[in-house]
Amino acid sequence: MSNRVLFWLDAEPTAFCIAYYLKKIHDTDFFTLVDVTNRQKSFFQSQKLVEFKKTWFYHDVMNQEIKSEPDYLKSFEEKYDIDLWQLAKNDRIFIDYYNTFYKFSDHEISEIMEKECRLFEEILDEVKPDFFITTQTAFRPHHLFYLLCKKKGIKVLMLNSANWGKHCYISGNYHKLDNFNELFANRKALPTTFNDIQNRLESKILSKKVSKFYQSHKNSKIKLMQAAFQLLILSDNSNEKTHYTYYGRKKLKVLLSEINNSIKRWYRKKYIDQNFLQEIIDDKPFIFLPLQQEPERSLLLSAPDYKNQIETVEYVSKCLPENFLLFVKEHPTQGSGRDWREISQYKALQNNPKVRLIHPSVPAAEIIKKS
């Protein structure tokens, strides 16, 4: 009997490419759950590159009416020991501060979660997969499905980015090597110093590539015009009616939001240039605390208790020895990727006598050397 393999596919093509090449070398039954927009959906409906025994489209089910059961979510949480509401309250789509296009009610969120939990259980009960193959989970539904597979004892094969150059690795967990202790114990000793490793990491740091990508796209007038033409003329905007992740994203509203964000980004960058330290003065001992880009998976899913970074800075500053300062550096991709933070947040940090805000252009290595 052949193995049964389940894939989570989305707009990022890596998982589909994995399925394509695996199918060439293994006679295995493939199944898939697909989370894409309407435009991309047509490809998965018509493609002949990979034969899937059955395909489910996540948002098709989210649009179906169900007869809700009041205790279903509670029983699901107890059955699998998964805190659904903890995941929901850290979903960027459901957080008003991040999603300015649509405000979800608790009832709507509850209904969405019930539909997806029923779908996920139905798929896993029907397929009974031997393996779940996926890329890194970035959004709540994908992460919930991954957690459910783990709880059901399904072998997870997750392709993780090593955040070290162009390397990746396969693991059963997000950003964790399954056999790290074994690999570490059996490794061959190499004449490598800490500085060697630090320099290698600095040369291959991922944030530099991400920042370059954002800048090349957001600073390109041609690409901005192409995006506006795509939005206003070519797009039918059907996702706004069929995908809850696009609720409220009417064409004009999205265009005005982008214009508004561009203006905000300019003013915020001007404030940063005028008010953040661009040289490290080490006349007093200090602790270095770099901020994380937000909204981002690394906070919302990996460290939800610390998603309010302003509160985290305030808390850490209160724990410092009396003669220490806290040097806080903005993330280099917060501007190009997220239009910087509100100026009021920066001012709140500046009002803390223990805090010094460091310009995002200052290399972290330089700060660490002087800390």
Model-derived segments and spans:
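Conserved catalytic-core segment of nucleotide-activated headgroup transferases in glycan assembly
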Residues: L232-I343
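Short, solvent-exposed loop/turn segments at secondary-structure junctions
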Residues: E12-T14, T37-Q40, M62-N63, T137-R140, ...
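Nucleotide-activated donor-dependent transferases that construct or modify glycoconjugates
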Residues: S2-E12, D35-V36, S105, I133, ...
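Hydrophobic beta-strand scaffold residues
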Residues: F30, V156, N160-N163, L326, ...
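Donor nucleotide-activated moiety binding/catalytic core segment of transferases
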Residues: S110-D125, L301, G337-S371
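Conserved N-terminal ligand/cofactor-binding loop architecture of enzyme catalytic domains
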Residues: Y21-F120, S161-N261, R265-W266
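Conserved nucleotide-sugar donor-interacting segment of glycosyltransferase catalytic cores
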Residues: R118-E182
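Histidine-anchored nucleotide/phosphate-binding helix
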Residues: W8-H26, D305-L320
